[in-house]
Curated annotation (Swiss-Prot):
Glycosylated; contains 2.5% carbohydrates. Chitin-binding protein. Has antifungal activity against F.solani, F.oxysporum, C.musae and C.gloesporoides but not against P.oligandrum. Depending on concentration the antifungal activity can be fungistatic or fungicidal. Inhibits both spore germination and mycelial growth in F.solani at a concentration of 0.1 mg/ml. Has antifungal activity against C.krusei, C.albicans, C.tropicalis and C.parapsilosis. Has no chitinase, beta-glucanase or hemagglutinating activity. Acts as a flocculent. GO terms for biological process: defense response to fungus; killing of cells of another organism. GO terms for molecular function: chitin binding. Keywords: Antimicrobial, Chitin-binding, Fungicide. The keyword Acetylation does not apply. On the 2D-gel the determined pI of this protein is: 10.8, its MW is: 14.34 kDa. This is Chitin-binding protein 3. It comes from Moringa oleifera. The lineage of its organism: Eukaryota, Viridiplantae, Streptophyta, Embryophyta, Tracheophyta. It comes from the Eukaryota.
Length: 22
């Protein structure tokens, strides 16, 4: 997902790796 940062911000996932968009 190219918009991983936005996805993480919405889900508030600060800890990498962030797999919010999978």
């Amino acid at each position: 997902c190219p918009a991983i940062q936005r996805c993480c911000q919405q889900l508030r996932n600060i800890q990498p790796p962030c797999r919010c968009c999978q």
